[in-house]
A protein has these predicted regions:
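Helix-to-loop junction immediately C-terminal to a conserved catalytic motif
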Residues: 48
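The feature captures the beta-strand-to-loop junction immediately N-terminal to the Walker
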Residues: 33-35
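Conserved structural motif at the start of ABC-family nucleotide-binding domains
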Residues: 2, 17-19
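Short coil-to-helix segment of the ABC ATPase nucleotide-binding domain corresponding to the Q-loop/switch region
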Residues: 92-100, 130
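ABC ATPase C-loop
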Residues: 150-151
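Conserved catalytic motifs of ABC-family nucleotide-binding domains
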Residues: 154
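Conserved ABC ATPase signature
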Residues: 133-137
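ABC ATPase NBD Q-loop/coupling interface
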Residues: 57-75, 108, 221-223
């Protein structure tokens, strides 16, 4: 689904990604791991076209080169993205937040209703709170709204940057259940950054560890050893 080769990125005078090679197989649930400041979010932003890359290639869905494709065009290619901090529209209602994604696609009214109903089926609380402002929701509810909005794009690839950050444990469990369900039922490929090791072990099928902008370990999640955790993840 995603193939990154020899990717380099600079932030000011800092070399943040070094000849990075990462594969995200179609249908996988890939967890990008590493301590803070190691390049995980930077890699996701490169995937989404939010920051420039210096060299290398990013191919998607059978070989489509993403470098040079505008960020809004990448979303239209079937990539849903939920960034750190969720970035919902706090002054808009829940319904209006969902409508933003739907309107951008130019869909017919019946299709918009179908997708809204689908999101409500995944997150009943969003239907109950449809007229509440996004800023009035709890952190967990905002995360559900952000994921729901991304799903209105009907993505082939869903990218989640620390989906469990700052939210209550019961919603963390619900988000884990949802990732597994979407992957199993729809074949949705998921790429997530996650610091919580128990959540990663439960949800991911595969992992990549970044250390100072380099991929230093990768494999099936069952191959993530205690030694790797101690060397690359423990603070």
């Amino acid at each position: 689904m995603i193939k990154i080769r020899n990717l380099n990125q600079f932030y000011g005078g800092s070399h943040t990604l070094w000849d990075l090679d990462v594969d995200v197989p179609k249908g996988s649930r890939m967890c990008l791991m590493g301590r803070n400041g190691m390049g995980k979010t930077t890699m996701l932003k490169c995937l989404m076209g939010l920051i420039p890359t210096a060299s290398g290639s990013i191919s998607y869905d059978g070989g489509k080169e993403l470098r040079g494709v505008a960020a809004d065009k990448r979303a239209g290619m079937g990539i849903g993205y939920v960034p750190q901090g969720r970035e919902i529209f706090s002054q808009l209602t829940v319904e209006e937040n969902l409508r933003v994604g739907l309107e951008a696609r130019g869909l017919k009214t019946a299709k918009k209703k179908e997708l809204t109903d689908y999101v409500h089926s995944l997150f009943p609380v969003l239907k109950q709170m449809s007229q509440r402002r996004g800023g009035d929701l709890s952190g967990g509810q905002q995360q559900q709204l952000a994921i729901g909005r991304a799903l209105t794009l009907e993505p082939k690839l869903l990218i989640l940057d620390e989906p469990c950050e700052g939210i209550q444990p019961n919603i963390v469990a619900d988000i884990g259940d949802l990732i597994l369900r979407l992957n199993k039922d729809l074949g949705l490929t998921v790429l997530l950054v996650e610091q919580k090791l128990p959540f990663a072990r439960r949800v991911a099928s595969d992992f990549v560890i970044l250390d100072k902008g380099r991929a230093v370990a990768k494999g099936a999640i069952g191959e993530l050893t205690d030694e790797m955790v101690k060397q690359h993840l423990t603070v």
